[in-house]
Amino acid sequence: MSEKATEIANLLSPTVESLGLELLGVEYLPAPGGATLRLYIDVPLAEQPERVINVDDCERVSREVSAQLDVEDPISGNYTLEVSSPGVDRPLFTLEQFARHTGESAKIVLKLAQDGRRRFQGEILRIDAEAEAVVFAVDGKDVQIGYDNIDKARIVPDWVALGLAPQKPNKPGPKKPGHEKKKPSNESAAGKPRAE
């Protein structure tokens, strides 16, 4: 997260927690016409998977956080507040969140290139807490990336495991009407050649 996003997350986290939810992270996207402030919320781990985030949760957080932002005023100028569940391609904001998703695949965008690349996709292998880094399996190699160099990270959903992968038909389906073999144009419908 950016410094501004981290500042806002630290400010709003107690408010979200007071509603019985967890603030996963914040995206602050400044723009000339007005910034976007996006909050990702989830239910605490102890309540998963029995409970999931719903629209009512997002509305409650939006109301409470809006009131707090009006008082604290950490953002100058106009902005749009968005409150969202993380979704299946959830963003990862902290080392703890990377640790929770060990064994899953993630897409990572770096602040500064590493090995000539800024974009990686690989399996999250482990967290090196001492080095404050995440180790990924990328193209058959272990790649250690410093947490401070990660700009954005998202889980890559395993659509097959979720039962949402598109199915390919194993054999050709039935022929559609109107696709029968056509008769040569010089034969009549009765099968006799036409006199011209």
Curated annotation (Swiss-Prot):
Disulfide-bonded cysteines: none
Region annotated Disordered, chain positions? 164-196
Tell me which UniProt keywords the record has, alphabetically: Cytoplasm, Ribosome biogenesis
Q: Name one GO cellular component term.
A: cytosol
The subcellular location is: Cytoplasm
Q: Where is the composition biased (Basic residues)?
A: 173-182
Q: Which GO terms describe its biological process?
A: ribosomal small subunit assembly; translation
Domain of life the protein comes from = Bacteria
Query: What biological function has been recorded for the protein in this entry?
Result: Required for maturation of 30S ribosomal subunits.
Report the PANTHER family cross-referenced here: RIBOSOME MATURATION FACTOR RIMP
Family as reported in the entry's similarity comment: Belongs to the RimP family.
Query: What is the protein name for this chain?
Result: Ribosome maturation factor RimP
Taxonomic lineage per UniProt? Bacteria, Pseudomonadati, Pseudomonadota, Gammaproteobacteria, Lysobacterales
Q: Which gene encodes it?
A: rimP
